[in-house]
From Swiss-Prot:
Subcellular location: Secreted
GO cellular component: extracellular region
Organism: Lycosa singoriensis
Keywords: Disulfide bond, Knottin, Secreted, Signal, Toxin
A Pfam family that the UniProt record links to this protein: Toxin_35
Name by which UniProt lists this protein: U3-lycotoxin-Ls1a
Disulfide bonds: C48-C63, C55-C72, C62-C87, C74-C85
Length: 115
């Protein structure tokens, strides 16, 4: 019985030591990965295409508005044969942003009344 108890304590100690080392390794890897993702996001944010500008070179480069990312929309101008692509905000997303803004303002008023 003493042998089983001693062996159990040894296994628990070994397991806790190995899991602590693994967590330290994962924590360091997560921090490094997070920093690299932030750097990539900052670099990508500088290269976005503003609304109503040409996005034919990269159709996924449109900038974000407050809540949603603009969409690269392509069309043929009247009487033209060349396709034109610009970053635009779809109407349904525009209305959703307006509704969210009004809800935010209304929430601020309620908070003022009861806060």
């Amino acid at each position: 019985m003493k042998f089983v108890l001693l062996f159990g304590v040894f296994l628990v100690t070994l397991f806790s030591y190995s899991s602590a080392e693994m967590l330290d390794d994962f924590g360091q890897a997560d921090e490094d990965e997070l920093l690299s993702l932030i750097e990539k996001e900052e670099a990508r944010a500088k290269e976005c295409t503003p609304r109503f500008y040409d996005c034919s070179h990269d159709r996924h480069s449109c900038c974000r508005s407050e809540l949603f990312k603009d969409v690269c929309t392509c069309f043929y101008p009247e009487g033209g044969d060349n396709e034109v692509c610009t970053c635009q905000q779809p109407k349904h997303l525009k209305y959703m942003e307006k509704a969210a803004d009004k809800a935010k303002k209304f929430g601020g008023k309620i908070k003022k009344w009861f806060g």
